[in-house]
């Protein structure tokens, strides 16, 4: 058996932990620079606020209904996510963190257990220790466990836990479960299936396997088998290096100056290089992009994209920043206001897999490695950005997070204060 623990409306729930006065009231959390809604409480969803809705388009709903609005506080959310994971580790020998608000639990080998009660116990213990509401689904496969956890959110009477294992129960659920909500079925795959009359997860399981293989290849077959109760998706409780890394941001104020834009891109490149080094990998290519505000139809639009190919796969700070800045100068167009920019590392491989050229200057490479290691050590001790390259600028461009809550769990100065009379 596998369990999927999914934190309900996670970012909004984190804000409520330290603001109990918001229980039962509409809450939303905004993205970088307070651009759009990325988390909504059930009460906010009921008001018609959609995921990803630009804030300026829903501001009238917010003001009319007294919706509590927060800027994203990733330090808080990351810490609360870890606290939930610590609770989950009490219930299973292995936990696979799937995302900041989801984790799989490997329950194989656990016998003579009332899994329905176990799911509810996991949920109640997460609430008791963290005050985060968690929906726990248990089923024979990871895909079915995902569906079971969704049922918990739809039906409060399940009390946060659902054990789905009997064939007749699985069939009943799959007959009503929309194909577009099945884990592993992407937008394009969904469009193909709908055009064939496949509207539910049950419809999908009734297709012949060879037809699924022809239509959606091996990933589609895995999902098909998982829905039929056959575990096909491996449990991954160890670290897996990312195959692409993107660092991007929307700007609070549009950037029209080339130096300001290249400074921002240099900082994104620095962060990307750091992420590569953290997983001991290197990138063969890097994409650099910048574009204007697509919501301003009355202003000129441009989308700039430049692909950089490294002669030698790299995670070196100076090499990556220099290449990113050069690309920024190449794609910049005068007269446009850039709203968002970023960098993406692709074709990633492990450092140990790199084949070095006979003509490579090994001494220079070793010197660059020592410099980068020293930068990482200093910034790791005294904080990110303590030492940086000149191309990264002075940090004069700040993101807008006017509605951010305190860092309750990660900064001493932000600890909640209690008055005793």
Annotated model-derived regions:
Residues 103-109, 304-311, 355-360:
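Short, hydrophobic beta-strand segments
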Residues 98-102, 139-142, 281-285, 336-340:
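Short Gly/Ser/Thr- and Asp/Glu-enriched loop/turn motifs at secondary-structure junctions
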Residues 111-115, 297, 349-356:
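Short, charged/polar, Gly/Pro-enriched secondary-structure boundary elements
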Residues 10, 33-36, 293-296, 348-352:
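Short, charged/polar surface micro-motifs in flexible loops or helix N-caps
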Residues 191-337, 353:
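DNA-contacting surface of Y-family translesion DNA polymerases
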Residues 1-225, 234, 274, 362-421:
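Gly/Gly-Pro- and Ser/Thr-rich, intrinsically disordered tail segments characteristic of DNA damage-repair
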Residues 325-381:
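C-terminal hydrophobic structural anchor segments
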